[in-house]
């Protein structure tokens, strides 16, 4: 009976030492490993010889079904039969694949499984020629790309599908009824009234009326007063009572204190009237003293009363208070005949005008400042 070598490989042989728990090399040179098959006994055996010496056996291992073969790495394999552990460090991956694949097939045949040929040539090196074959594959790719272009016209038919969606806009008309919302904002202008008081507004109104209308009327009274001082005592009495009678032409300053909402306007007018009365009283005393030694010129202006009476006849309201006050003002009548009192009265009236104007301007400026401060405070 003869044995035949099935496959062989080259590698360094190791044995496992349980004492040191390490792999111990059996030789320092690679060994030749061969698997033998005995066709008569149907047995397998692994033989490993060190170097070129055919009698230096490193492995003489009978392969049975109990043997376990494992691959620790690509080039280091090991097998054991519960007594000895062998490790083979192959010189190349190809030798490792050849020996490992053949050994596994032997174990499979011993266990009753179908034999498989050892993968001795699974990785042939002629793989380099297929690389130049890749360039010829590019032309078909370009040819395939050309038919893809005609697929673009398929998209246009989808556009008409969107067209039927156009009828949706008619639903928009019901929106117009919303605009009537804006009217509520107008009630906002109320806050400015809270800035200043009603008394201040009334005071400003009275001061403005006094400065515009009252002063103009007093000027007319002053002009007319010059004539009666020379002619009749009735005109002088009417001018002296201008602050008390509301119906007279020169009595416009008197209503100002009554119509003013606050106390500032009334106090101002009261002070002005008091100053005016004092000035008139002071002016009347020297006139009486100066007119006392010259009573003779009194009969000269007797014909003058006729035009004055005719000029003052239309306003009946003015003639009535003159009759009432004539009795009270009879004593100073001699002073009216003198020409000097008219000039003195005009100067006093002019100074009084200036004082009234200055006082009114001051009060108006104060009122303006107060109104501005109130408006600024209300805004903050």
Swiss-Prot record:
GO BP field: actin filament bundle assembly; actin filament organization; actin filament polymerization; actin nucleation; cell-substrate adhesion; chemotaxis to cAMP; filopodium assembly; hyperosmotic response
Compositionally biased residues, Pro residues:
115-139, 166-192, 294-306
Enumerate the residue ranges of region (EVH2 block C).
348-380
Q: Where is the WH2 domain?
A: 199-218
Any Pfam family hit: WH2
Q: Compositional bias (Low complexity) at which positions?
A: 233-259, 307-342
Region annotation 2 X 15 AA tandem repeats of [LI]-Q-[SK]-[AL]-K-[DE]-E-I-L-[ET]-[AE]-[IV]-[KR]-[ES]: where it falls in the sequence: 349-378
Q: Keywords in UniProt for this one? A: Actin-binding, Cell adhesion, Cell projection, Chemotaxis, Coiled coil, Cytoplasm, Cytoskeleton, Repeat
Q: Which GO terms describe its cellular component?
A: cell cortex; cell leading edge; cytoskeleton; cytosol; filopodium; filopodium tip; macropinosome; phagocytic cup lip
> At which residues are the sequence repeats?
349-363, 364-378
Give the span(s) annotated as EVH2.
Answer: 229-380
Per the entry, what this protein does is:
Ena/VASP proteins are actin-associated proteins involved in a range of processes dependent on cytoskeleton remodeling and cell polarity such as lamellipodial and filopodial dynamics in migrating cells. Plays a crucial role in filopodia formation, cell-substratum adhesion, and proper chemotaxis. Nucleates and bundles actin filaments. When complexed with fotH in filopodial tips, may support formin-mediated filament elongation by bundling nascent actin filaments.
Protein family per UniProt: Belongs to the Ena/VASP family.
Q: How does it assemble?
A: May self-associate. Binds F-actin and G-actin. Binds to the FH2 domain of forH.
Q: What is known of its domains?
A: The EVH2 domain is comprised of 3 regions. Block A is a thymosin-like domain required for G-actin binding and actin polymerization. Block B is required for F-actin binding and subcellular location, and Block C for self-association.
Protein name per its UniProtKB record: Protein VASP homolog
What is the species listed in this Swiss-Prot or TrEMBL entry?
Dictyostelium discoideum (Social amoeba)
Encoded by which gene?
A: vasp
């Amino acid at each position: 009976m003869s044995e035949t070598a099935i496959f062989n490989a080259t590698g360094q042989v190791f044995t496992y030492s349980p004492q040191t728990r390490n792999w111990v090399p059996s030789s320092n040179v690679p060994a030749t490993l061969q698997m033998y098959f005995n066709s008569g006994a149907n047995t397998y055996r692994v033989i490993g010889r060190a170097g070129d010496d055919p009698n230096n056996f490193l492995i003489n291992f009978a392969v049975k079904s109990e043997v376990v073969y494992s691959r620790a790495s690509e080039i280091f394999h090991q097998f054991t039969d519960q007594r000895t552990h062998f490790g083979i460090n192959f010189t190349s991956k190809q030798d490792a694949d050849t020996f490992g694949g053949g050994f596994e097939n032997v174990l499979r045949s011993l266990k009753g499984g179908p034999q498989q040929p050892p993968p001795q040539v699974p990785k042939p090196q002629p793989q380099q020629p297929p690389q130049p074959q890749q360039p010829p594959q590019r032309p078909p790719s370009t040819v395939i790309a050309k038919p893809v272009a005609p697929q673009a016209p398929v998209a246009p038919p989808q556009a008409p599908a969107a067209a039927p969606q156009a009828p949706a806009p008619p639903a928009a008309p019901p929106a117009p009824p919303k605009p009537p919302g804006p009217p509520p904002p107008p009630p906002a202008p109320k806050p400015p009234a809270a800035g200043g008081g009603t008394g201040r507004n009334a005071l400003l109104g009275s001061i403005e009326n006094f400065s515009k209308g009252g002063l103009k009327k007093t000027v007319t009274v002053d002009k007319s007063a010059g004539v009666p001082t020379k002619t009749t005592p009735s005109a002088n009495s009417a001018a002296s009572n201008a602050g008390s009678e509301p119906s007279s032409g020169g009595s416009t300053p008197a209503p100002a204190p009554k119509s003013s909402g606050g106390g500032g306007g009334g106090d101002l007018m009261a002070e002005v009237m008091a100053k005016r009365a004092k000035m008139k009283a002071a002016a009347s005393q020297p006139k009486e003293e100066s007119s006392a030694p010259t009573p003779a010129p009194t009969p000269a202006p007797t014909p003058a009363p006729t035009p004055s009476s005719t000029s003052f006849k239309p306003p009946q309201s003015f003639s009535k208070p003159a009759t009432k006050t004539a009795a009270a003002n009879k004593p100073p009548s001699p002073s009216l005949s003198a020409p000097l009192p008219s000039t003195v009265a005009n100067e006093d009236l002019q100074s009084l005008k200036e004082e009234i104007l200055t006082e009114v301007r001051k009060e108006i400026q104060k009122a303006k400042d107060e109104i501005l401060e109130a408006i600024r405070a209300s805004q903050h």
